[in-house]
Regions:
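Active-/binding-site microenvironments in catalytic and ligand-binding cores
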Residues: 4, 10-276
């Protein structure tokens, strides 16, 4: 409180709530029984509730019995059988190839510069493009022109595709457009080091690529977006979600990966941060 100079009354300063940014969760959960990956790569989480573990907790202390625990309850715990590529995750260049930047050893997820993972974000809206379509550099430029934005180095560019709304559906891994070599290098040549998609893969769905390969026998089509990392190292976030909630620009994207030693990827709780 402070003194009023003229009246001598003690007045209260008006309280102002501090400005708090808006946080938007753009990640999918790790969960059982959702077709977010091919069958060979599905998540399995085993859950144990408090009553099941009372004996384990009590057994850690000689002379203790489960009935002496509060309400006879232990702890809740989960055991997960997962790949580093389950859930929303950040791929390191090591995932794509043993080398990057034209021959240097590709870096693993624990070696990624953390400052790459907390940067202004740019959302490209490609929901109108058909499933399996391979985005071109011209389409990227046209979308940037539509939103009135010029890319700056180290911005995080994410693609909102038709796959986003298909999460949870049986055909999720076949949905959405993808990015090949040309589009990927078009972005990284402008200083972009982290990209992302709400699809299963940064590349076009495997089912669409398989059809193109069957028609052309062109091996360069296979995983061409990922393999662009041989030429210039970059990271990509896969299986983002809720990108429809984001503006085209004006947000910060946070995607710090879990530090898995010498790994090709790390899980991330990706978040978009908007000013109040």
């Amino acid at each position: 409180m402070y003194e009023c100079a003229k009246s001598g009354r003690r007045n209260r300063r008006p309280w102002r709530t501090p400005s708090v940014p808006k946080f938007i969760d753009i990640s999918i959960p790790l969960e059982n029984d959702v077709a977010a990956d091919p069958p060979f790569q599905r998540v399995r989480i085993d859950y144990q509730a408090h009553a099941e573990t009372a004996g384990v907790l009590a057994g850690a202390f000689p002379g203790m019995t489960p009935d002496r625990l509060p309400d006879g309850m232990g702890w809740a715990v989960e055991t997960a059988h997962i790949s580093t590529h389950n859930g929303t995750h950040l791929d390191a260049p090591w995932h794509y190839h043993p080398t990057m930047d034209g021959g240097a050893r590709a870096v693993t997820i624990d070696e990624i510069p953390l400052d790459w993972c907390f940067r202004p974000g740019v959302k490209l809206d490609f929901r109108h493009l058909p499933d399996g379509h391979v985005v071109t550099p011209a389409e990227i430029d046209a979308e940037l022109a539509r939103i009135g934005h010029r890319l700056s180095p180290f911005e995080i560019v994410v693609a909102n595709t038709a796959a986003g709304k298909a999460y949870g559906d049986a055909d999720y891994i076949d949905r959405g457009c993808g990015f090949g070599r040309d589009a990927t290098l078009h972005l990284v040549s402008q200083g972009i080091r982290v990209v992302g998609t709400d699809g299963w893969s940064w590349d076009a769905p495997f089912s669409a690529t398989a059809r193109r390969f069957a028609e052309t026998n062109d091996a360069s089509l296979i995983w061409e977006g990922h393999k662009a990392g041989r030429e210039k190292g970059y990271c990509q976030i896969e299986k983002l979600h809720n990108l429809e909630a984001l503006p085209a620009t004006g947000f910060t994207l946070c995607c710090f990966p879990v530090k898995v030693r010498a790994a090709s990827a790390g899980w991330t709780r990706a978040v978009a941060i908007l000013p109040d």
